Amino acid sequence: MDGGNEIWDGPKLVTDGEWAGWRTWAGMDAFEDQTGPFYFREENGVIRSAFRAEPRHMNGGGFMHGGCMMTFADYSLFSISWAHLKDVRAVTVSLNGEFLGPAKAGDLVESTGEVTKAGGSLLFVRGLVSTGGAPMLNFSGVIKKIRPR
C-alpha cells in the first residue's frame, strides 16, 4: 500500500481467533504491521475496518495516541477503497482528520466510510473512526493510483 513494486496478491483472510472472517494486509506495509495489526471486512455492502487497542497504542495520558488514530485512518482509506484498488498500487496524497474522542486499551476501534468520488487516478474518501459507538476521529483523504511504467 506504499506504491512499491513488490508482488501483491491481495489481502489475506483470517481463519481463526477474534478476527476470523476478517481480511488483513499484514506483511504489505511495515509501518502498519508495527502499529496494527488492522483488519477489514464487508458487512451488507459496507467496509468496516477494526483493531483491538493495546497499551502500546496509548499516549502518556492513557488514551489512544493521535498518531495511532491517523495511521488507522490511513489504513481505512485503503480498505474503504478496496473495490477500486484491485490489481493496482496506490499511495495516500492527502489525509485530514479531526479528533473527537478517546479510546482506551482493550477497546474495539472501528471505522466505516465511503468513496465520495472515484476518478481515473484519484479516489476521494471520507470516514469515521469510533469505539463503542462513540466517535473518535472524523477523516477524509485522497488516494492516487500508481500505474506501472
List the predicted regions and their residue ranges.
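Terminal targeting signals and extreme-terminal segments of soluble enzymes
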Residues: 1-149
